[in-house]
Amino acid sequence: MSTFIQIPNSISQLTSKSKLEEIFTYAAIRSQIKDGNLQAAFPQNQLTELVGVNDRSIRNYIDTLENFGLIINTTKKHGYGEYAHNVYQLEYLNKEYFIMNPSLITEQGISPKLKGLLMLIKANCVKGTNYLEFNSK
């Protein structure tokens, strides 16, 4: 697992009502990348616990993230068919991303919605800084 988590700045362009939870869900999935292959396995029941919503909401968030092109829900052949096993293929980020400390994912004193808001603010900051341009006119 890497020291920091890369989050694309494009995540700020999500438009749904639950975009803060979707941003946090994406970061939680991305935090599970191991050995640099850009695949993350995260059981849905653990994800629902972490985000604090029901299974249906998590499925909706993942569908939104897939439609936005941030994750690919991979399926594996098993027995007589193909099944999704909560393994997600993530894109390689070579520019236009920010990094965050993975301890934010497991921080107990902050709600998932507030964590998503913090990431949304960071995605809109000037690249490489914590400076948010604001024009008062």
Cite the ranges covered by each PLM segment.
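Short recognition helix of helix-turn-helix/winged-helix DNA-binding domains
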Residues: 1-50, 66-72, 78-136
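Short, hydrophobic-biased segments on the C-terminal half of alpha helices
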Residues: 59-63
